[in-house]
Amino acid sequence: MSVILNEVRRATYLDSIILMRISRQIAALPGIEEAGLIIGTPANKEILRDAGILGSESDSAEPSDLILALRASDALAGEAALAEARRLIDHPSALGAAAAVESSRTMRAAIKRLPAANLALISVPGDFAVAEAHKALELGLHAMIFSDNVPLDDEAALKRKARERGLFVMGPDCGTAIIGGVPLGFANVVPQGDIGIIGASGTGIQEVSCLIARAGRGITHALGTGGRDLKAEVGAITTLMAIDALDADDHTKHIVLISKPPAASVARLVLDRVAKSAKPFTICFLGASDVALPANARAAATLKATADIVVGGSAASWAQQPLPGLGRGGLVRGLFAGGTLCSEAQIIFRQAGLAVMSNVPVPGASAIGRAQDGKVLTDHVMIDLGDDEFTRGRPHPMFEPGVRDGPLAEALADPSVGIILLDIVLGYGGHPDPAGHLAAFLDGREHRPLIVASVTGTDADPQPRNAQVEALAAAGVIVADSNAEATEAAIAALGPSLDRA
């Protein structure tokens, strides 16, 4: 019978990235069914309670405390896992070189150690991120806020304060940026060039920058804004500042803007600013339609189309290419680590006239809960496994590809599923071998649906893309050059006899 074990470490703080890495290692230990290392805020305790691993001893945990929570197959496995967690918390350098950096107790102390620094990357629980961002701004630092769960009013106030000081606030929930060739957060190794990217989406920036790189071009900067910057309450403060910066940069010749559809009033602000530039823009408002753009801007419906416009190329459609299993029918089940890649797939399904459901639906798609209350699914389904409902108390699937194992096993066993659509996202911050994990999971599983995947990354990444593609191909996975082409391949494999919505 499973046992629940908790331990509270008083007045203990570790960076959220380190906590996720420790969680991943503990969850992989023998006999561990679920594991979470998390700061003891009320919201985080609720996450652990929902996951079924919060013990009564953790009820008294404060926001300054660290909770170790796990479910194990037996007490012996649980105690061994707790001991390993204690060791890694006390000696985070054991995680590897990335964790073995000198640390400072305060931001002021860090500035004394590195006085030339001009940017703070903030990765603390949302309850503390606002205060740390204010400290950064007051010290004259730009702020990239990796943290989420920051109130919208606080985000707007931070960005107004930054604008007054001539500083950037990227985020909250900004997972990706590349500044002068230096990747921050989840980002890929791409060459420098003359294309600037502004993105409200981390995986959107990653996909477009990698497609540009694989076409032989490069970027100047990729500036993340956070997913809510284009809401009316924030007013696109960071987006507008980023346009100003890239417009003034002599090395940037073409500017790309990627986001979900903005509020109408905010869209006018952004497009009015675009119109004042002498530079060409490519604008991808994912899921938007009939947006009137200024003369110097072109619209792109997908991330792939965005890259094609920028580099002046276009790949042949998978609808005209031979595929094994063509016309096999059934339903497509998409299981994505990247939220924007999930959105792009839905858009392509809707463009093809196909009904699609998702836990994060784009306009025209239907909403679905995680379990759909036991209802039989009769439409194609695209699931964002990085959404909060799947990551409460667990690592993000880009850290831990095992998050996809359960939903993938369900899809493999579902007789209504004919095709499975997957994304593999590489780069700094991600799992060291996501393709290897998937290949091992698929090993020995016969009579399975057709599996189509894309690999977002470059050959220069810590996990070289060419090696990841080879591992997937050896496992019998069809690998497309982009997420859009993988989606087109899945649709093509359905064959010509499709029910159109």
Regions found by a protein language model. Name each.
Residues 2-501:
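Catalytic-core regions of core metabolic enzymes
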